[in-house]
């Protein structure tokens, strides 16, 4: 915990609340003192949605400090269960209330079967699912907590479904389909990215199975294993869940962000590789009960089964299938090259006055790991702009970031201290700054 003038990534409970408020019919209860309850105001101001932010603060005051928190927290959980009837109630402390060192899991267990709020004897069992966000508020930031909370919610409902249907193997959709993981509230242009991702998948003949968590329902999380693969556009949130689904259900995932022409092509080729490995054919229907495909089996599946041709209804993209064998997807000639040469506006923009003014000029990039790495490569490879410094505030993902941007910039900066970023910008005097709101202030 530290006192800061500016924070690139907020405290852990903000990430938990962002995930909870992204789902439909999910309510979050924040066990916190006054002063930590600014999330409602922040989200209402930035998102401009019609519905109220589904977050209730269980305030830690002098009465709580004197008597303990259990009675008040349990009362708030059961009250919201009766008033809102949500599918899920998520309880989270803040870094401040964590100082009390209370076992909130006991409160969750008590709320599931608790005494009536009115003091009458008897049992008043909450109809909603109640979970405690399992996050260390002293060791992780907002993005790490969001990723962990999303994985925890998905794990909770998939294990719940597994207990109800112990002998049932999830069946895949008839047509190739994907889950888009990581679109959530207060994300940087997440809605625009989601629209473009859906358009991209549709052009490739791939259906969208579920979009999690933004606008999704926790009751639909049981449908996640029905998709053929998972698409994770941002490393900051969704990667843990994709790894969990791969481990438990052998679902492959694509974690390449389609930013820029080159990386978009790389992402599409990775999707093509996955679809070909899965043989496009209801590959799991002939497996014995409870059997999971290994990577070796996936890679050798097409040779073993001679890859029967795909039904006509699957051929949404003209030329997606190899014309000779009619067995595998081939997006290279009919989609990637066509988009790159004739559809993309990159060639036009590279000759525009805006881009020419920046050619051979110096630029500084700073942001989260996904966007900073993507923008750095776009500027260096596709626009001919010299990136003198590229940086990120995601210190937990520093190794991946350095691996991505090495060779595309002169210096690499990994820090969450805005003063270091300001000093670097003042020293380099770039012609353009690509960064967060703080870098905008620094540039002025």
From Swiss-Prot:
Listed GO CC annotations: chloroplast
Which domain of life, per UniProt?
Answer: Eukaryota
* Function according to Swiss-Prot or TrEMBL: Component of the dark-operative protochlorophyllide reductase (DPOR) that uses Mg-ATP and reduced ferredoxin to reduce ring D of protochlorophyllide (Pchlide) to form chlorophyllide a (Chlide). This reaction is light-independent. The NB-protein (ChlN-ChlB) is the catalytic component of the complex.
Task: Cite the annotated pathway.
Answer: Porphyrin-containing compound metabolism; chlorophyll biosynthesis (light-independent)
Protein name, please?
Answer: Light-independent protochlorophyllide reductase subunit B
Q: Which Gene3D superfamilies does the UniProt record give?
A: 1.20.89.20, Nitrogenase molybdenum iron protein domain
Pfam families membership: Oxidored_nitro (PF00148)
Q: What processes does the entry annotate via GO biological process terms?
A: light-independent chlorophyll biosynthetic process; photosynthesis
- Name the major location: plastid
- Source organism phylogeny: Eukaryota, Viridiplantae, Chlorophyta, core chlorophytes, Chlorophyceae
Entry keywords, A to Z? 4Fe-4S, ATP-binding, Chlorophyll biosynthesis, Chloroplast, Iron, Iron-sulfur, Metal-binding, Nucleotide-binding, Oxidoreductase, Photosynthesis, Plastid
Please list the reactions this protein catalyses.
Answer: chlorophyllide a + oxidized 2[4Fe-4S]-[ferredoxin] + 2 ADP + 2 phosphate = protochlorophyllide a + reduced 2[4Fe-4S]-[ferredoxin] + 2 ATP + 2 H2O
Quaternary state and interactors: Protochlorophyllide reductase is composed of three subunits; ChlL, ChlN and ChlB. Forms a heterotetramer of two ChlB and two ChlN subunits.
Q: What species is this protein from?
A: Chlamydomonas pitschmannii
């Amino acid at each position: 915990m530290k006192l800061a003038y500016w924070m690139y990534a907020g405290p852990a409970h903000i990430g938990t609340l962002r995930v909870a408020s992204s789902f439909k019919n999910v309510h979050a209860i924040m066990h916190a003192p006054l002063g930590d309850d600014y999330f409602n105001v922040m989200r209402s101001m930035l998102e401009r949605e019609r519905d109220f932010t589904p977050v209730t603060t269980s305030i830690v005051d002098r009465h709580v400090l004197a008597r303990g928190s259990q009675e008040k927290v349990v009362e708030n959980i059961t009250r919201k269960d009766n008033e809102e009837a949500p599918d899920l109630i998520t309880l989270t402390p803040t870094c401040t209330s964590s100082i009390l060192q209370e076992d909130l899991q006991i409160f969750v267990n008590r709320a599931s079967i608790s005494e009536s709020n009115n003091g009458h004897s008897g049992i008043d069992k909450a109809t909603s699912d109640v979970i405690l966000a399992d996050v260390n508020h002293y060791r992780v930031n907002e993005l790490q907590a969001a990723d962990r909370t999303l994985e925890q919610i998905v794990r909770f409902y998939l294990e719940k479904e597994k207990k109800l249907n112990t002998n049932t193997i999830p069946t895949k959709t008839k047509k190739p389909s994907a889950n888009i993981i990581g679109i959530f509230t207060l994300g940087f242009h997440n809605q625009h990215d989601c629209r473009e991702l859906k358009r991209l998948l549709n052009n490739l003949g791939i259906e969208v199975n579920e979009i999690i968590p933004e606008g999704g329902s926790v009751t639909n999380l049981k449908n996640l294993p029905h998709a053929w693969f998972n698409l994770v556009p941002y490393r900051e949130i969704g990667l843990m869940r994709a790894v969990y689904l791969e481990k438990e259900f052998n679902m492959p995932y694509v974690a390449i962000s389609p930013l820029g022409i080159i990386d978009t092509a790389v992402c599409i080729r990775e999707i093509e590789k996955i679809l070909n490995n899965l043989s496009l054919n209801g590959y799991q229907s002939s497996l014995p009960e409870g059997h999971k495909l290994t990577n070796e089996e996936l890679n050798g599946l097409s040779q073993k089964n001679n890859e029967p041709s795909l039904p006509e209804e699957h051929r949404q993209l003209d030329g997606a299938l190899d014309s000779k064998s009619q067995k595998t997807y081939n997006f290279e000639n009919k989609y990637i090259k066509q988009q790159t040469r004739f559809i993309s506006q990159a060639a036009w923009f590279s000759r525009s006055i805006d881009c020419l003014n920046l050619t051979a000029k110096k630029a500084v990039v700073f942001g989260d790991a996904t966007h900073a790495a993507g923008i750095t490569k776009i500027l260096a490879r596709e626009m001919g702009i010299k990136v003198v410094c590229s940086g990120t505030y995601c210190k937990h993902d520093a190794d991946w970031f350095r691996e991505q941007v090495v060779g595309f910039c002169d210096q690499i900066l990994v820090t969450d201290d805005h003063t270091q970023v300001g000093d670097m910008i003042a020293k380099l005097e770039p012609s353009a700054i690509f960064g967060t709101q703080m870098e905008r202030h620094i540039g002025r």
